[in-house]
């Protein structure tokens, strides 16, 4: 059975870009008569905002989206909150070839959050180090192999992670599990078959496929959809409060009007306000055209 998911982080108000990705992931699940799962990626505790998770649920419900499993309603693979799953990540980590790394916090401070920008390659400083003067992170020993995969939107992608990123962190030196490992473990455990997410995460995919291979598991199908940008072409971020769903709701826009606007932002020929279920055929045409 098709199993898709939307996995937001509770670090602020959901903006238009998040909403469009959620809409597309929901449409993909419903077009395929599958399950739509909500998972909360809250490992970055320093940036987590109180009440953000509940606001995400309210925004999704207001938009007209429903889900079959999630952190609010539970399901077969609960808990659906990453901060409640550390023992699972620790268990999976023992199955990987790893080594401790005591490089400075500056080198590793961003690995808990999903990465959105190009990261510098790690030089392997601690690969052969046997003693450490301070607390250590845990790095996955990346093999020198080329990873090739076909993305449902972006086409064929190839990358040698050892050449581009090097050995990457799976646990930070403060004990927090990193995005790459947690994401893969959760998708495996929740039996996710298809991952539709923003193109800002395309660069994470080869690393995640390496982890799937290390676990002798089959990766899901990936679809990295275009990001919604502002008039300057910049990716929308949660700091753009004027574009948050909460603010738009308070301004008086209706969910059907916003759904129409999101559809139009994808180039879909939708003129009237509509419910998400009215876009199923549009999504079929769009995803087929995107896959070429």
Regions found by a protein language model. Name each.
Residues 14-16, 173-176, 252-254:
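Structural motif
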Residues 1-116, 199-200, 204-217:
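N-terminal Rossmann-like or analogous alpha/beta NTP/dinucleotide-binding catalytic cores
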Residues 45, 104, 203-204, 214-292:
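Catalytic adenosine-cofactor/nucleotide-binding cores of aminoacyl-tRNA synthetases and other
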Residues 107-237, 244-249:
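Active-site cores that bind ATP or allylic diphosphates and position pyrophosphate for catalysis
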Residues 53, 86, 105, 119, ...:
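Alpha-helix initiation and N-capping motif
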Residues 60-71, 124-134, 251-254:
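Short, basic, helix/turn surface patches
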Residues 61, 91-100, 154-162, 272-291:
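A short, terminal or domain-edge coil/loop segment
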Residues 55-63, 87-94, 120-126, 241-245, ...:
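Short, structured secondary-structure boundary patches
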């Amino acid at each position: 059975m098709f199993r898709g998911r939307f996995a937001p982080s509770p670090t602020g108000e959901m903006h238009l870009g998040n909403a469009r990705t959620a809409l597309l992931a929901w449409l993909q699940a419903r077009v395929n008569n599958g399950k739509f799962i909500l998972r909360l990626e809250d490992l970055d505790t320093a940036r987590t905002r109180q009440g953000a998770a509940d606001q995400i649920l309210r925004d999704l419900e207001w938009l007209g989206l429903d889900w079959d499993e999630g952190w609010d309603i539970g399901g077969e693979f609960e808990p659906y909150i990453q901060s409640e799953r550390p023992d699972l990540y620790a268990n999976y980590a023992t199955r990987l070839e790893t080594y401790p790394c005591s490089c400075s916090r500056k080198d590793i401070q961003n690995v808990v959050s999903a990465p959105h920008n190009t990261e510098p390659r790690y030089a392997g400083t601690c690969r052969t180090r046997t003693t450490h003067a301070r607390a250590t992170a845990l790095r996955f020993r990346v093999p020198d192999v080329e990873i090739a995969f076909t993305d449902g939107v972006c086409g064929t992608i190839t990358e040698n992670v050892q050449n581009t990123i090097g050995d990457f962190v799976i646990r930070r030196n403060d004990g927090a599990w990193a995005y790459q490992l947690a994401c893969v473990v959760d998708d495996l455990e929740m039996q996710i078959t298809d991952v539709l997410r923003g193109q800002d995460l395309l660069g994470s995919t080869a690393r995640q496929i390496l982890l799937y291979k290390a676990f002798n598991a089959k990766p899901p199908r990936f679809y990295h959809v275009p990001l919604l940008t502002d008039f300057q072409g910049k990716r929308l971020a949660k700091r753009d409060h004027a574009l948050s769903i909460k603010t738009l709701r308070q301004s008086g826009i209706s969910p059907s009007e916003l759904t129409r606007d999101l559809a139009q932002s994808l180039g879909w020929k939708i003129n009237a306000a509509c419910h998400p279920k009215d876009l199923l055929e549009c999504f079929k045409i769009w995803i087929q055209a995107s896959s070429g």
